[in-house]
UniProtKB/Swiss-Prot annotation:
Gene3D superfamilies: 1.10.287.310. One of its GO terms (cellular component) is cytosolic large ribosomal subunit. One of its GO terms (biological process) is translation. Disulfide bonds: none annotated. It comes from the Bacteria. It comes from Helicobacter pylori (strain Shi470). This is Large ribosomal subunit protein uL29. The keyword ATP-binding does not apply. InterPro entries: Ribosomal_protein_uL29, Ribosomal_uL29, Ribosomal_uL29_CS, Ribosomal_uL29_sf. Keywords: Ribonucleoprotein, Ribosomal protein.
Length: 66
């Protein structure tokens, strides 16, 4: 997921996507603890995707304030 894809979405879509990605990250942590996660690098990717979504949300709010 790239930032350019995210900046075109509405705030509602971004918040729904953020909620879904946080749930996915939780599932990955559970799988890691249960030794069922085949690729631990997926946690890093999920965290970075969450950060990208948060950046897009913050950019939306900062542009609406100005």
């Amino acid at each position: 997921m790239k930032y350019t894809e995210l900046k075109d979405k509405s705030i509602k879509e971004l918040e729904e996507l953020l909620h879904a990605k946080k749930a996915e990250l939780f599932e990955l942590h559970v799988k890691l603890k249960a030794m069922q996660l085949s690729n631990p690098n997926e946690i890093k990717k999920a965290r970075r995707n969450i950060a990208r979504i948060n950046t897009a949300i913050n950019a939306y709010y900062s542009s609406s304030v100005e």
